[in-house]
UniProtKB/Swiss-Prot annotation:
Membrane side Cytoplasmic: residue ranges: 1-6, 84-91, 143-159, 233-243, 293-311
Transmembrane feature ranges: 7-27, 63-83, 92-112, 122-142, 160-180, 212-232, 244-264, 272-292
Residues the record marks as active site: E58
GO function terms (MF aspect): metal ion binding; oxidoreductase activity, acting on NAD(P)H, heme protein as acceptor
HAMAP family: HemeA_synth_type1 (MF_01664)
Residues exposed to the Extracellular side: 28-62, 113-121, 181-211, 265-271
Pathway: Porphyrin-containing compound metabolism; heme A biosynthesis; heme A from heme O: step 1/1
Protein name, per record: Heme A synthase
Enzyme class: oxidoreductase
Signal sequence, start to end: none
Gene label: ctaA
Residues that hold heme o according to the record: H61, H123
Length: 311
């Protein structure tokens, strides 16, 4: 059964990643109304008779979201049953399921009633939490923490501050990026790093949305760079923290490069999807570090108790 659960966890993680990228594809191609205003049917039909490209993209996104719902539900039930001895299992299972349902309902509401771009931008963030929760469940199932000896990990308050702070802030950056997509502001500023050669400062809403995201992205790049330097200096003996921050910096660098290329490639589809891919992976890595940070407090108490007993 454990072998089956491992395969299920991997397939579910991949399916949720496809759902995330599919949502970005729907937004990028303007396929949100590919099935009209009907849900769960497509243009009022179970199998649509008129298959335009927008309909195919929207319908594919709905099908992958539906399969993700089934897989996440099954994974939550099995992990709850067979891995309940691991402290975070139940919390992650609940988060995975609840946020997936919230994402599906919000997507359906956007189709039927329509939503403001500021509200639609939350849709990607909700999906991201479900994805990260499933990734963490997968890590627990594969016992990644044991391989990195994470059970004995103890972090100082400074490192935990950076882990929690960067993760929360990354969610804000994700929201600003999603807002750029839904406001159709990807090409509002044709230059980089300033908005335009003729107008370095933004003058209208779409330019402010674009430049706000750029500033937020630059700040998270600098913050992760600083945290990585701390990890390299002080956590070489803790490989999970050491490599966690190095991987985070690699991902945020790739994210930044692709973000610039989105501007200079006229918002090409490939760059837009890579932009969503890298931030999804980065958020999952940061959430894993958060989980380790919560364990660190427990590990410190256990170490202190053991020390008192030996005395």
């Amino acid at each position: 059964m454990q072998r089956f659960i491992k395969w299920l966890a991997v397939i579910t993680s991949l399916d949720l990643l496809i759902v995330l990228l599919g949502g970005a594809l729907v937004t990028k191609t303007g396929s949100g109304q590919g099935c009209g205003k009907s849900w769960p049917l497509c243009n009022g039909e179970f199998v649509p008779s008129n298959l335009s490209m927008e309909t195919i993209i929207e319908l594919s996104h709905r099908l992958t979201s539906g399969s993700a719902g089934i897989l996440v539900t099954l994974l939550c039930i099995l992990s709850w049953k067979y891995y309940k001895h691991v402290r975070e299992t139940k919390t992650l299972a609940i988060l995975s399921f609840v946020f997936l349902v919230a994402q599906a309902l919000m997507g359906a509401a956007a189709v039927v009633w329509g939503q403001m771009p500021a509200v639609l931008a939350i849709h990607f963030g909700i999906s991201l939490i479900s994805f990260a929760s499933v990734i963490l469940l997968t890590c627990l199932i594969f016992e990644i923490d044991q391989k990195f000896d994470a059970r004995s990990l103890i972090m100082d308050k400074k490192m935990k501050f950076h882990i929690y702070g960067v993760t929360i802030y990354s969610y804000i950056v994700v929201y600003t990026g999603a807002l750029v997509r839904h406001e159709r502001a990807s090409l509002a500023c044709p230059d980089f790093p300033l908005c335009s050669k003729n107008r370095p400062m933004p003058t209208q809403l779409h330019e402010w949305v674009q430049m706000g995201h750029r500033v937020a992205a630059m700040l998270i790049f600098a913050w992760i760079l600083y945290a990585m330097i701390l990890a390299i200096r002080h956590y070489k003996q803790q490989p999970v923290v050491y490599w966690g921050w190095i991987i985070s910096f690699i991902l945020v660098t790739l994210q930044a490069v692709v973000g610039v290329l989105v501007v200079f490639t006229n918002a090409s589809l490939a760059m837009a999807l890579l932009h969503s891919l890298f931030i999804s992976c980065l958020f999952a890595v940061l959430c894993y570090l958060v989980m380790l940070g919560t364990r660190s407090k427990v590990n410190a108490k256990e170490a202190e108790l053991t020390s008192k007993q030996t005395k």
